[in-house]
């Protein structure tokens, strides 16, 4: 397959991944519970470009917009030694799987250290790992309490993390909701009623006593 065909094929896969990302992740926040602790996670439109691994001159906002609207062109992406075709192909496949990971059994990894940076958390299904950090503005001030996906690793990252925990609960809600309204995953040995009060206070009444 030639380079042009590679780009055309990847662009089609990016469009599919963007559609899944838009339908299942953007505009929502997710609450992951593990060991009685929790973190809140956002999957932002602005992070989509980086997660694909492709090289492009488009801004993060334009890249996602074009992909979601199925307007992205093969001429707008390229591959480099830092953005190889084979890795991009695997990463784009994983983006589509993040939606499933956000509602299924998985592990929470703490303190993931890679060759280039450190991530506070990551969640994995043993095949890939979205790596999470808090978001900061240009002045170094923290932007909100939620974690965002900064990187998508094509590995489980267990060996790169300090500690691994089993995720026991995953909840979601629209960004504008005051409390979490949907239970996406519940470990077979866990209950909602058994959660610490701090977490239960974050849940809509319809989710309590499950």
What residue ranges belong to the model's regions?
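Compact beta-sheet-dominated globular domain cores
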Residues: 125, 129-190
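An acidic, glycine-rich, mixed-charge low-complexity segment common to nucleic-acid enzymes
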Residues: 1-117, 122, 172-210
